[in-house]
């Protein structure tokens, strides 16, 4: 494909998704004024979307109860580990390690815990490309699994105190290898970790100087690894006086973390990163203030900050609704969770990687850029191909067919309108434009050989056959197998579904 054509297609895709963000009927009350839509929004952002049963359950709750349910996940018994034990996985291999986490995201009853692990994985990044994976030898048959251990650290501390998280990640072997902390020696300090600690993890550009970085790097000297575990070597530590962010003393590495987190930019930086991950980009100062206040009054509790975020009116505003493009992981996991598909995730690491997100292997220290970067002509095609593979799965030993017939029977869906409205509610919050609805109804009523409209035509309501007389064939297996699968595909591949 010529570069100009490639770029034109990418722009067209991004424009279609942007248009979808504004496609709901603005003459009607905003979607987030309805409790059901609020809950669907909350479950997408604080998790990966929800099945019809879970959405019904949360709709019966008040907002406070729903947020409490998500935040206090430790009281929820989760049987994901027992499910994982039934699948043969060797987490020393990157593909199986990715499958292991994707399965946790798909089947966990604690979706916010997994979403927060994904947040920390993108902020406090480390990757297999440099950290490596365990390589047993006769001399060392059980080497430590640094990436898995870091991952479990994030899970244990997902909603903990920010200081505990930063202190822990500073000594984490995967992070030390990723940013060369183990080579930080007296007389020749390595500035990598000190720089990223301030720039990416805690303060942001403009809130520190190059001198602060150099002095902090001196404080981290003496840190190293021995047999894959953190060790402090006093003889390799610079014991001289350092001045960091205006404070002077004979500081060590842990002192640097505490000094940095006492800076007023630290709570604001974390508040902004949380807001942009869960709500929308470029928040106003008034959006961040409740989170900053929660940080200050609770000694840096991430749980308190998220409670402030998930109960903020701005989180349920028009600006927040469908304002983020789903990451590949959110897209894949969400579709599987919402349709109730049973899978061993064998093909999912390849799918998310081709879409631009290889878990445990971010592109660089800044993680994934996200936003519009998720959608190019190539990654859009991968999303469409995934949707097709998911809805046409026929029990291939890895992914079971979506239980579409069971859904129709359980919810007594026997008319074209009922079927379209059911899946529109499940996948698109019921925000199906009249043009899209008419196109979908016409598709259901057309013969089995009728072509599928394209996702973009679906949004525009331009598919041939729109407006035709609608008659539902008897709910024969062939109708479910062909037409209802196609309907699910069209909604999953639509520009609207790409938005979280």
Feature locations, PLM:
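N-terminal secretory signal peptides and thylakoid transit peptides that target proteins
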Residues: 1-14
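Charged, compositionally biased N-terminal leader segments and the immediate start
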Residues: 6, 26-31
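Active-site substrate-binding loop specific to GH73 endo-beta-N-acetylglucosaminidase modules
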Residues: 7, 17-23, 134-354
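A general structural motif at alpha-helix termini
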Residues: 10, 59-62, 71, 169, ...
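Flexible, low-complexity segments enriched for small/polar residues
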Residues: 30-35, 39-52, 263, 267-298, ...
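Extracytoplasmic/secreted proteins, especially bacterial periplasmic and envelope-associated proteins
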Residues: 34, 38-42, 50, 54-57, ...
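Alpha-helix C-capping/helix-to-loop hinge sites
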Residues: 46, 104-105, 123, 127, ...
